[in-house]
Amino acid sequence: MYIAGIMSGTSLDGIDVALVHVEGNGVDSKVELIHFTTVPFCKDIKNEILQALSIDTSNVQLICSLNFKLGLCFANAVEEVCKKADLSLEQLDLIGSHGQTIYHQPKQEGNSISSTLQIGEPAVIAYETNTTVISNFRTMDMAAGGQGAPLVPYSEVILYRHQTKNRLLQNIGGIGNVTVVPSHLSDKSVIAFDTGPGNMVIDDVCQRLFQLPYDQNGRIAKQGVVVDEILTYCMNHPFLKMNPPKSTGREQFGEEFVSELLKRFEKHGKENLLTTVTMFTASSIVHHYKEFILPYYEIDEVILGGGGSYNRTLVEMIRNGLKEEKCAIFIQEDIGYSSEAKEAIAFAILANETHHRNPSNVPSATGAKQSVVLGNITFPPIR
């Protein structure tokens, strides 16, 4: 089957679309990446997403309209990746769309129950591409008592399991998340959870202080020094003290967190602030390994993915934090994969599993009461 996986993450870099060919289903599936592209958001759409993400600027009319606008954007992105791969839409069998997360509340707070909302209307995607769309992957896991995240562990088992090596798969997107993929698999041996901010805080600080979308290759962070006072403040965040399974997002590490950070510590200088929040991402990752993984698993390899794996300063900080551990550290490209395409590929794989009615959440990672089939299916019109 030819499947397009669509991912629009918390970092708002754009729309990632992976066109893959999948043979079979289940953990023995064979997955081949045919083509990958990122379609940047136009300025107006990105601004509307940012407005929708903020409780202060969001409203129901905005979210309602944006839901359909993003559906059209996602459909156009699918058409673009197929065109670049010289594949007609008629040859495309399935689309897996994660959608754009507007709000994610993994646990009950007061009168608000655990819930999540991703937008990007699947009916629009299905109509425009004339292809079946599977979307809303997180909701069934949450209905089953899970946190709806992380969902990539199932795909990581398919793509990265090794006969003799225990591996850690660390994604560094807007949020960081880790998956333990042991050489001998069982339902309870695969664990996964969010490790805290990935690029989210780094990018926000970079945009506010340097008017740049991100710190390319970690060049600016390399120029500063880590301020212990700031790092201690960040590492005392309550999320880092929670036991897995757990998930997080902009609700905890978004605009409000960064605004408070800059208000408290702006006197320390721009470069030092960026260096320190880069170290915060690295330290939060290392902290979670040493606290929740390394005491229980003998890890052979750590494989870094996501946009953060291109930040050389961040990667070096992670290496230094793990230098006493007996594990090799790679990025996706070192082993023949793509850091950028990883999550889009994951949702193509999850779509394939849903198409075959296979459960694809990992309860030991999300906290769900049971394994469930993920997603809603939207069929195109008969033409």
UniProtKB/Swiss-Prot annotation:
Function recorded in the entry: Catalyzes the specific phosphorylation of 1,6-anhydro-N-acetylmuramic acid (anhMurNAc) with the simultaneous cleavage of the 1,6-anhydro ring, generating MurNAc-6-P. Is required for the utilization of anhMurNAc either imported from the medium or derived from its own cell wall murein, and thus plays a role in cell wall recycling.
Gene Ontology terms for molecular function: ATP binding; kinase activity; phosphotransferase activity, alcohol group as acceptor
Origin superkingdom: Bacteria
NCBIfam families per record: PRK09585.2-1, PRK09585.3-2
Protein EC: 2.7.1.170
InterPro entries: Anhydro_N_Ac-Mur_kinase, ATPase_NBD
Gene, per the UniProt record: anmK
GO biological process: 1,6-anhydro-N-acetyl-beta-muramic acid catabolic process; amino sugar metabolic process; peptidoglycan turnover
Family: Belongs to the anhydro-N-acetylmuramic acid kinase family.
The keyword Kinase appears for this protein: yes
Binding site for ATP: G9, T10, S11, L12, D13, G14, I15, D16
Chemical reaction(s) catalysed: 1,6-anhydro-N-acetyl-beta-muramate + ATP + H2O = N-acetyl-D-muramate 6-phosphate + ADP + H(+)
Keywords, sorted A to Z: ATP-binding, Carbohydrate metabolism, Kinase, Nucleotide-binding, Transferase
Protein name per its UniProtKB record: Anhydro-N-acetylmuramic acid kinase
Pathway(s) of this molecule: Amino-sugar metabolism; 1,6-anhydro-N-acetylmuramate degradation; Cell wall biogenesis; peptidoglycan recycling
